[in-house]
Curated annotation (Swiss-Prot):
Gene it is expressed from: nuoD1
Name of the protein described by the UniProt record: NADH-quinone oxidoreductase subunit D 1
Keyword Ribosomal protein: no
Top-tier EC class: translocase
Quaternary context: NDH-1 is composed of 14 different subunits. Subunits NuoB, C, D, E, F, and G constitute the peripheral sector of the complex.
Upper lineage: Bacteria, Pseudomonadati, Pseudomonadota, Alphaproteobacteria, Hyphomicrobiales
Length: 396
């Protein structure tokens, strides 16, 4: 009779693990090297964001959204601003829409660059993150030149954007596009055909399209499994319906397909950015960049120096805030990680009655057990990397 040793381990992956992307704790049950169960423990970065928003005016709630997915801050603000605008029933001018779309796509590139390069680092490639961060640095400077802040911009406000873009900045963003595509080709050359990178990602973390819908996936996760579902095309907001871009889809639903989709999406984002830059320098060169009804957007500084009414108006907007008609609304945007939704309930006062945040990463993380079961221990880091989890939005 042969003796067979059963080697069952229970190990902790994180919360201080470099591949855990923040403060994730996974409790893994292993049979030798094979993963039998993955139990994500979340809540280590919980700050009570949704409850805090209920105590702030509609304008004061904006900065909380920067701190959710802090890799692409403006995309989160976008969903909130659209929700408030929907309740107020206001339209924002075309220049404001173009600026928003431009910076949303910058956010998408920021997020995908970080994800693609750090996922490469998780499986052992050390060069891509250095190249990726070099490009992200330039984009952070564009954030800073628009809003004064590199990360927590609070730039998209209900009613438009906080301030106009100088023409030189728009030109510089246009000039950045082509050299970036060259840098992207370099990362592409390094990873896409790389034997080791492919062995670590092809046929790992496969999800069928039915499972995607069942788990509530969105964004790259759904497109990797073959559905051309993108809110920018399916439920267009701002001026996306006037812009030309393609939606890449995968056919295997594995880590490698998701990586390829993120690479193509960055190129498509550049394509959208070029169209926005062209319009901001031609037909939308001048004009208002935020709502002009004066009920939501504070008066200009110059006006406040001359007019007492403007000063009083400014004071009221920043102390009491504006009252939003009672009602409820759900607004979603195609954030880099998936469908980022804001469910906003107003009771007619100057503060939200309830603000539910639907973070895409939350739905993706809960499928860790389903995706990793039966894989090797080393694949857990690769699967986690391809989900693109950021803990600010998961724990809120």
């Amino acid at each position: 009779m042969t003796e067979h040793n059963v080697r069952n381990f229970n190990i902790n992956f994180g919360p201080q693990h470099p591949a855990a992307h923040g403060v994730l704790r996974l409790v893994l049950e292993l049979d030798g090297e094979i993963v039998e169960r993955v139990d994500p423990h979340i809540g280590l970065l919980h700050r009570g964001t949704e409850k805090l928003i209920e105590t702030k005016t509609y304008l004061q709630a904006v900065p909380y959204f920067d701190r959710l997915d802090y890799v692409a801050p403006m995309n989160q603000e976008h969903a909130y601003a659209l929700a408030v605008e929907k309740l107020l029933g206001i339209q924002i001018p075309i220049r404001g829409q173009l600026i928003r779309v431009l910076y949303s796509e910058i956010g998408r590139i920021l997020s995908h660059l970080l994800n693609v390069t750090t996922q490469a680092m998780d499986v052992g490639a050390l060069t891509p993150p250095l190249w990726g961060f070099e490009e992200r640095e330039k984009l952070m400077v564009f954030y800073e030149r628009a809003s004064g802040s590199r990360m927590h911009a609070a730039y998209f406000r209900p009613g438009g954007v906080h301030q106009d873009l100088p023409e030189k900045l728009v030109q510089d963003i246009g000039d950045w596009c082509d050299p970036f595509l060259k840098a992207l080709d370099d990362i592409d050359d390094l990873l896409t055909g790389n034997r080791i990178f492919k062995q670590r990602n092809v046929d790992i973390g496969v999800v069928s399209l039915e499972d995607c819908w069942a788990w509530g996936f969105s964004g790259v996760m759904v497109r990797g499994s073959g559905a051309a579902w993108d809110l920018r095309r399916a439920q267009p907001y701002e001026c996306y319906s006037d812009l030309e871009f393609d939606i890449p889809i995968g056919k295997n639903g594995d880590n490698y397909d998701r990586y390829l989709i993120r690479m193509i999406e960055m190129r498509q984002s550049v394509r959208i950015m070029k169209q926005c830059v062209n319009r901001l320098l031609s037909d939308a060169r001048t004009g208002p960049f935020s709502s002009i009804d004066g009920k939501v957007v504070p008066p200009k500084r110059g006006e406040m120096k001359r007019s007492m009414e403007a000063l009083i108006h400014h004071f009221k907007l920043y102390t009491e805030g504006y009252h939003v008609p009672a009602g409820e609304v759900y607004t979603a945007v195609e954030a880099p990680k998936g469908e980022f939704g804001v469910y906003l309930v107003s009771d007619g006062s100057n503060k939200p009655y309830r603000c539910k945040i639907r973070a895409p990463g939350y739905a993706h993380l809960q499928a860790m057990d389903f995706m990793c079961r039966g894989h090797q221990l080393a694949d857990v880091a690769a699967v986690l990397g391809s989900l693109d989890i950021v803990f600010g939005e998961v724990d809120r």
